[in-house]
Amino acid sequence: MIQTETRLKVADNSGAREILTIKVLGGSGRKFANIGDVIVASVKQATPGGAVKKGDVVKAVIVRTKSGARRADGSYIKFDENAAVIIREDKTPRGTRIFGPVARELREGGFMKIVSLAPEVL
């Protein structure tokens, strides 16, 4: 469960290393985001020469959470870290590579480009 002020690792090569959640999108007064949800975030750490700079306000999709997600078959999936991928308005990633595994829930959210770039889908 990701909420406002949560810091997330960035799992792509867009140039950002860490982002801070500003707002969870999807409804008035929504408090938490899970895997596959879109957030508005600020870049807190960035690599030199990257496409995004420190202080940029970006949209990102959650790809891994420590709290995990419950699936329809009753199983749960949890990860070691909270991570997100920075996206454009059309749900495509800003970077060209995805690092680490991503959850299968992204497929239902329409993030097929992220699923196809990921090295592993769990």
Curated annotation (Swiss-Prot):
Keyword Amino-acid biosynthesis appears in the UniProt entry: no
Q: Name one GO cellular component term.
A: cytosolic large ribosomal subunit
**What GO terms in the biological process aspect are recorded for it?**
translation
Keyword annotations: Ribonucleoprotein, Ribosomal protein, RNA-binding, rRNA-binding
A single GO molecular function term of this UniProt record: structural constituent of ribosome
Q: What does this protein do?
A: Binds to 23S rRNA. Forms part of two intersubunit bridges in the 70S ribosome.
Give the protein family: Belongs to the universal ribosomal protein uL14 family.
Under what name is this protein listed?
A: Large ribosomal subunit protein uL14
Which organism is the protein's source? Streptococcus pneumoniae serotype 4 (strain ATCC BAA-334 / TIGR4)
